[in-house]
């Protein structure tokens, strides 16, 4: 059944300046509207490596909601567990500067409580034969609890990302039950009540190793933008994965692609360092294009012996 991904769908509204961006001023530019959301991007990234993931989520009961389902089906994502409900999708509004980085953003989260009912009815069917589980940690508490219960029942690995760290902090105790948690440097600072902005990757890796051990977590990865990423495991092993050097067009979705690559590697036999390397390659492929998901790859390009099912 492949990797099961759970989370929310967003509509991304992105504004780009045509000339030098003036904070607080009027800026002529272009505006794009695309399908987004951390987990929606992640499931499409996984599908673009010719793997066949399953998406458990919600969409609006409108034409836009159907468009989201149609696009995912075109990429060979199993969409049978996507429910259509009123106001099922969130909205993310972002303004980019001239370097392709987000200058300001605001989001409206959807109500994801219907996922709890869906998992009560079909949880065994969804998780019994899956290869692994990827989840947004800031879903409803009951939903996260259900997923972790099914993971224990069927002995499945669970990997977690985050879209709103303030909400995810309320689920901090669940991190001990997650096989690998991935977030960025700022989010890691919130998680451990510290400021890591001044640390080099090597220093960050050492700090992370201590924090992962003391918090009784299995493993964790922190992305550091252009400096790459660092990882640490409960046994104290840690390391740095340098970023790939590419021309930046649009950074949207790079973190999601990194998470997708890391999940793919850890699911299909790679160690944490090798998995982060896959994540780094997928992230680089997103940064240098205008899309917020990676282009098509084949598993063998990452040393994965996974049969491609057409």
Name each model feature, range by range:
Residues 3, 27, 194, 198-310:
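Conserved phosphate-binding/catalytic region of the ribokinase-like
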């Amino acid at each position: 059944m492949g990797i099961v991904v759970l989370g929310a769908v967003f509509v991304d509204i992105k504004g780009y300046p045509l000339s030098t961006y003036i904070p607080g001023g009027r800026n002529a530019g272009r505006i794009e509207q695309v399908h987004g959301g951390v987990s929606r991007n992640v499931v499409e990234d996984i599908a673009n490596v010719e793997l066949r993931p399953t998406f458990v989520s919600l969409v609006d009961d409108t034409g836009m909601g159907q468009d989201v389902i149609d696009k995912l089906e075109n990429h060979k994502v199993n969409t049978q567990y996507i429910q259509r409900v009123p106001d099922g999708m969130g909205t993310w509004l972002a303004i980019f500067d001239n370097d392709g980085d987000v200058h300001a953003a605001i989001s409206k989260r959807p109500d994801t409580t219907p996922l709890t009912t869906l998992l009560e009815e079909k949880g065994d069917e969804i998780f019994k034969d899956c290869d692994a589980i990827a989840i947004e940690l800031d879903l409803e508490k009951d939903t996260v609890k259900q997923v972790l219960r099914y993971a224990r029942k069927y002995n499945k690995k669970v990997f977690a990302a985050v879209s709103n760290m303030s909400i995810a902090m309320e689920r901090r105790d669940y991190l001990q039950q997650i096989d690998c948690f991935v977030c960025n440097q700022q989010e890691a600072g919130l998680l451990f009540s510290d400021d890591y902005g001044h640390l080099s990757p090597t220093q960050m890796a050492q700090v992370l190793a201590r924090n992962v051990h003391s918090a009784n977590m299995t493993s964790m990865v922190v992305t550091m933008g252009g400096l790459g990423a660092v990882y640490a495991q409960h046994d104290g092993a840690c390391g740095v994965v340098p970023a790939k050097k590419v021309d930046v067009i649009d950074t949207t979705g790079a973190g999601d692609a990194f998470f997708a690559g890391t999940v793919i590697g850890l699911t299909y036999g790679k160690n944490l360092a090798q998995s982060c390397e896959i994540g780094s390659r997928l992230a680089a492929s997103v940064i240098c294009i205008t899309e917020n998901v990676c282009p098509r790859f084949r598993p063998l390009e990452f040393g994965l012996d996974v049969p491609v099912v057409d």
